[in-house]
Amino acid sequence: MSNLLAIGIAALIVALIITIVVWTIAYIEYKKLVRQRKINRLYKRISERAEDSGNESEGDAEELAALGEVGPFIPGDINNL
């Protein structure tokens, strides 16, 4: 019986680790998607303002440039998105 219990506990631990990995990957992809949507909104706003006024908005262009600077990828550092 203890052998079966050990196998059951090991299976639960493996399932927990797999769940954590999957949800972490999903969270990272979600953050990338949110970031891309923000960039697309800024790009669209800059384009609309450029059409209306004939020149680009400086503040929006600077914000878009700041979003483009990601930096080095460090696995495990979730704030590096």
From Swiss-Prot:
It holds the Pfam family Vpu. Ion channel activity is inhibited by hexamethylene amiloride in vitro. Phosphorylated by host CK2. This phosphorylation is necessary for interaction with human BTRC and degradation of CD4. One of its GO terms (biological process) is symbiont-mediated suppression of host type I interferon-mediated signaling pathway. It comes from the Viruses. Keywords: AIDS, Apoptosis, Host membrane, Host-virus interaction, Inhibition of host innate immune response by virus, Inhibition of host tetherin by virus, Ion channel, Ion transport, Membrane, Phosphoprotein, Transmembrane, Transmembrane helix, Transport, Viral immunoevasion. GO terms for molecular function: CD4 receptor binding; monoatomic cation channel activity. InterPro entries: Vpu (IPR008187), Vpu_cyt_dom_sf (IPR009032). Homopentamer. Interacts with host CD4 and BRTC; these interactions induce proteasomal degradation of CD4. Interacts with host BST2; this interaction leads to the degradation of host BST2. Interacts with host FBXW11. Interacts with host AP1M1; this interaction plays a role in the mistrafficking and subsequent degradation of host BST2. Interacts with host RANBP2; this interaction allows Vpu to down-regulate host BLM sumoylation. Belongs to the HIV-1 VPU protein family. This is Protein Vpu. It comes from Human immunodeficiency virus type 1 group M subtype F1 (isolate 93BR020) (HIV-1). The gene is vpu.
